[in-house]
């Protein structure tokens, strides 16, 4: 008997919603990346986009552990000479919390065409509302919350 290999048409994609309130950012990112890759399914294969859609709400209430709010910087470059910009994690969390959560999750996905396809199934919202109620997302509970 040969090993079962899933085909692209055999995979079904369900929807999950994760509430990021008081959840440590790294632990949230690991769980979301595993859902996006499909590693929670018994039919996981690294060459198939078998992951699910993930909707994250309340990104503005995510917990950052340690002294990272003031002590850790986030960098980006404009592409011009002298164009390196830096902000602390606290400043980024105040301005665009959805981008901070999205960058943490996308950084845990493969850096290939397949990884970009997986990251397109990630939807992050700063507040408690999202426009994906028609897809009937299933709540996904993360057991460990910040103290």
From Swiss-Prot:
Gene responsible for this protein: rplM
Taxonomic lineage from the root: Bacteria, Bacillati, Actinomycetota, Actinomycetes, Mycobacteriales
Family statement: Belongs to the universal ribosomal protein uL13 family.
SUPFAM superfamilies in alphabetical order: Ribosomal protein L13
Keyword flag Cell cycle: no
Protein name (record): Large ribosomal subunit protein uL13
Record-linked InterPro entries: Ribosomal_uL13, Ribosomal_uL13_bac-type, Ribosomal_uL13_CS, Ribosomal_uL13_sf
PANTHER family according to UniProt: LARGE RIBOSOMAL SUBUNIT PROTEIN UL13M (PTHR11545:SF2), RIBOSOMAL PROTEIN L13 (PTHR11545)
Organism domain of life: Bacteria
A UniProt-annotated Pfam family: Ribosomal_L13
